[in-house]
């Protein structure tokens, strides 16, 4: 089982996160940020990852530290659970519709953290959630997972749908990228021999 457990404590957040890459899409998420919880449940379901997240953060300031730090912890968990990356597909992509929104994501588990982010979210807030924090979440994720992730908006006018489409699409892309290819089970998918 490709599994990771992350405990990350700072002056701003206290996080415990578990991840099973070979799960069934089950999740138990409690970050103190309702919209982020919703997005992570969708991410886990559509990625077929078993994911638990417990976070106590300084949400009396705002949701920035919690959102970014959960992204960091999730990235650390992916890196840990993937180990040496033997046999993985490495690449994954998905064009996903969410009503009027159409979101493309593409991932390379390359060992290099990079985010190509192109979402035009019309609203500054959805409920109490600052929509600019979606980019902060994914930056924290890619830097710590050491993955390249592109998120592109091809259509969409509803802020909730755009963000939901991005998390669902990223889950599906990562599901494809972490999948084991039987023909290459003992190989690292790189001519360098390491990722």
Report residues per predicted region:
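Structural preference for solvent-exposed beta-strand-turn elements
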Residues: 1-195
């Amino acid at each position: 089982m490709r599994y990771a457990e992350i405990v990350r404590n700072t002056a701003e957040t206290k996080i415990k996160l578990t991840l099973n890459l070979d799960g069934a899409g089950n999740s138990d998420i409690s970050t103190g940020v309702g919209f982020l919880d919703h997005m992570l449940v969708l991410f886990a379901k559509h990625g077929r990852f078993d994911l638990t997240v417990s976070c106590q953060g300084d949400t009396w300031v705002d949701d920035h530290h919690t959102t970014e730090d959960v992204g960091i912890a999730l990235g650390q968990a992916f890196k840990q659970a993937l180990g040496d990356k033997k046999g993985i597909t490495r690449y994954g992509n998905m064009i996903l519709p969410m009503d009027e929104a159409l979101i493309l994501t593409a991932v390379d588990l390359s060992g290099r953290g990079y985010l190509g982010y192109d979402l035009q979210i019309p609203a500054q807030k959805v409920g109490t959630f600052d929509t600019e924090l979606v980019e902060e979440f994914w930056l924290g994720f890619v830097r710590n997972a050491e993955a390249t992730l592109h998120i592109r908006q091809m259509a969409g006018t509803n802020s909730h749908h755009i963000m939901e489409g991005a998390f669902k699409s990223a889950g599906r892309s990562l599901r494809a990228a972490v999948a084991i290819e039987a023909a290459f089970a003992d190989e690292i998918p790189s001519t360098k021999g390491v990722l």
